[in-house]
């Protein structure tokens, strides 16, 4: 990364509560914008929408969403930020993430 931070903000229609369809959609979008940016920012809960069925849709930190995001970050050499429905034990919540191309992971 140089002296200028190039950011891509992505906002799209989602397929309600369909992680796989939304991950596929974002993968296609990423293939067109990477190389021209340093940071990609996804919307809140981009894989499911802001669903109230959190128990059914939540996943662990090493689940499908973060696994895909880490792969994209590494393959496209871009940092990626967003959030997803996370599970920690019996608790579910909206967890923010920031994944760097070197594999560094940051959560809040």
Regions found by a protein language model. Give the residues of each.
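Cys-nucleophile CN-hydrolase/nitrilase-fold catalytic domain and related Cys-dependent amidase chemistry
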Residues: 19, 27-101, 106-107
